[in-house]
From Swiss-Prot:
GO terms for molecular function: ATP binding; ATP hydrolysis activity; ATP-dependent DNA damage sensor activity; mismatched DNA binding. The keyword Transcription regulation does not apply. This is DNA mismatch repair protein MutL. CDD domains: HATPase_MutL-MLH-PMS-like, MutL_Trans. HAMAP family: DNA_mis_repair. Pfam families: DNA_mis_repair (PF01119), HATPase_c_3 (PF13589), MutL_C (PF08676). Coiled coil: none annotated. This protein is involved in the repair of mismatches in DNA. It is required for dam-dependent methyl-directed DNA mismatch repair. May act as a 'molecular matchmaker', a protein that promotes the formation of a stable complex between two or more DNA-binding proteins in an ATP-dependent manner without itself being part of a final effector complex.
Length: 595
């Protein structure tokens, strides 16, 4: 087969596939151009999740006719001049590929007017062909329009997800960009409806509240770390405000949203290791300002990956600051300032080898002192009261079945405010009260749903709550399922909702937290079928049952156990954990050597 030289049109389409994989990439590149043009106000409009229209308007510097004509040429950029500049990148974009790639697969237009000039120019191009430039009389700044994205690459269209999914990806990206650039105003529209609007502010906390919600912003603590080569401004949830998923974890490097390097992600989780449950996650936003020569962003065209020259140094600083803040009770804001670097010492470290840390190690401050605990000789204790040789007695548990029980099960009491002790037919049973209550509620709820007899409790005072724009979109897409299951939710303003009714069987509980937890569960599996989502909602709602630590009366315990054995699957909770543990009289007597 002979070797052929590809046409420029084919080359452009192939290159476009690397830079513009989906509408999200086009939106991201255009918004970054606006930021690099020092815009203080950016408006983004999309239709059909960006496939029909993407329009980005800004009040930045604009372009003259010469720069406008160069802007759509591949590898034409105002950000760098040569390879050396890659080591000192201050802008978000620098490759000179974005506009050429977008123009190759869309009907593309730029309208721009440079600051200080009386008039502007408009450039239009269809699939990198028929380039036209004409005068334009608009305001200072730039408006970029992308219509019929991928009209000439049907294979690319075929691999796009649903409008809901593609729109969600765009909104997620714009949320990150708005969080990173809190000093710029953003207005985001989808199908001519406002998705979110964030006014220009000098407060990161205000922007976090605008995007991620006031309730979340109130839970955040703050530490500031000033170092000669890097500054960190960290907003993080405390020990009592852990989250069900990793949704609220952001890293911004020089105002660029990036993925967490594995090393820094490990640092965050290690900092929280002893502060939150293993199945929970922290919310954390890290804003870093670092010398551009200390990072490498030229790793992937998406510019989501970044390498730090001294990850170990940053790890050390961040870990100690976060760990100390979590251990400390009070003082929501902590500031750590480092002395200027000793240049001679720093140079000596560089000469001695690359393993020398670039960041000076810091002394961990003493939060409080404890008296040393007395040391016990556990070995001698083990010799005198070891139960290892009896461990196998309790390991052999008989299979639990409803047939093992009769109606005369006797509740003995509750221990540790978590377990209910009962006896039946000469055997002893330990019930996990939370797992048992979850199973009872789950099957009652499921039964009422299938028979369409869900009893509704109207709320005297509706519960209002806010969500981030992307989570709002997810709730709107699934709101009918909630309503079918008796959880009545209404839109109540931009990214605000209210709950007006809920299933009576759930009892007197806060529905706001339950709904937020359910949405987090759905987000983890966005592509689940409707039946799976219904089941997920019911399972999540039932988590609000009797908890471990709740004091249960004798009558409540008796009713719970009786209800449990009316269930089809009484011996596991809806999430698969066991509800009961059986110890036979025979096992007990063997342990005490009565047999």
């Amino acid at each position: 087969m002979p070797i052929n030289i590809l046409s420029q049109e084919t080359v452009n389409k192939i290159a476009a596939g690397e830079v513009v994989e989906r509408p999200l990439n086009a939106v991201k590149e255009l918004v970054e151009n606006s930021l690099d043009a020092f815009a203080s106000s950016i408006t983004v409009e999309i239709e059909e999740a960006g496939k029909k229209l993407i329009r980005v308007s800004d009040n930045g510097f604009g372009m003259d006719k010469k720069d406008l004509e160069l802007s759509i040429l591949r590898h034409a950029t105002s950000k760098i001049d040569d390879f050396k500049d890659l080591m000192h990148i201050h802008s978000l974009g620098f490759r000179g590929e974005a506009l050429a790639s977008i123009a190759a697969v869309s009907n593309f237009a730029i309208k721009t007017r440079k600051k200080g000039e009386n008039s502007g120019w408009k450039l239009s191009v269809a699939g990198a062909k028929d380039i036209k430039v004409m005068p334009w009389s608009g305001a200072e700044g730039t408006i970029t329009e992308v219509k019929s994205l991928f009209f000439n690459t049907p294979a690319r269209q075929k691999f796009l997800k649903s409008d809901s999914t593609e729109r969600s990806r765009i909104i997620n990206s714009l949320e990150e960009t708005a969080l990173a650039n809190y000093d710029i105003s953003f207005k985001i529209f989808s199908e001519n409806k406002t998705v979110f609007s964030a006014a220009q502010t000098d407060s990161k906390t205000e922007r976090i509240a605008d995007i991620l919600g006031k309730d979340f912003a109130k839970t955040l603590k703050n530490i500031k770390i000033d170092h000669p080569k890097i500054s960190l401004d960290v907003y993080f949830t405390g020990r009592d405000n852990s989250l069900p998923n990793k949704k609220y974890q952001y890293l911004f490097v020089n105002s660029r949203p990036v993925n967490y390097p594995k090393r820094l992600m490990h640092c965050v989780y290690q900092s929280y290791k002893e502060s939150i449950p293993r199945d929970k996650y922290p919310g954390i936003l890290i804003y870093t300002d670092v010398d551009p020569s200390e990072i490498d962003v030229n790793i992937h065209p998406a510019k989501r990956e970044v390498k730090f020259a001294d990850e170990n140094g940053i790890y050390d600083i961040l870990f100690k600051a976060l760990r100390n803040a979590l251990m400390s009770q009070g003082h929501p804001e902590i500031k750590i300032t480092y002395p200027p670097l000793d240049k001679e010492k720093s140079a000596k470290q560089e000469v001695e080898g690359s393993t020398a840390p670039r960041f000076p190690k810091i002394q961990q401050p003493v939060i409080y002192a404890r008296e040393p605990k007395p040391k016990y000789n556990y070995a001698s204790l083990k010799q005198t009261c070891s139960i290892d040789k009896y461990a196998d007695v309790f390991a052999k548990q008989e299979e639990l079945t409803p047939e093992n029980f009769d109606s005369n099960i006797k509740v003995i009491g509750q221990v540790f405010d978590t377990y209910i002790i009962a006896s039946n037919k000469g055997d002893l049973y330990i019930f996990d009260q939370h797992a048992a209550a979850e199973r009872v509620r789950y099957e009652f709820y499921l039964s009422q749903m299938k028979s369409q007899t869900i009893k509704i409790q109207q709320m005297l005072m509706p519960e209002n709550f806010d969500l981030s724009p992307s989570i709002s979109e997810l709730l709107k897409a699934n709101i009918n399922i909630f309503n079918e299951l008796g959880i009545s939710i209404e839109e109540f303003g931009q990214n605000s909702f209210r709950i007006t009714a809920y299933p009576a069987l759930l009892g007197n509980i806060s529905m706001e937290q339950i709904v937020k937890t359910i949405i987090s569960d759905i987000e983890d599996d966005k592509h689940a079928e409707i039946e799976q989502k219904r089941d997920k909602i019911i399972r999540s709602a039932c988590r609000a049952s009797i908890k471990a630590g709740d004091n249960v009366s004798f009558i409540e315990a008796k009713k719970l156990i009786n209800d449990l054995f009316k269930c089809k699957q009484p011996f596991t909770c809806p999430h698969g954990r066991p509800t009961a543990y059986k110890i036979s009289l025979n096992e007990i007597e063997k342990f005490f050597k009565r047999k």
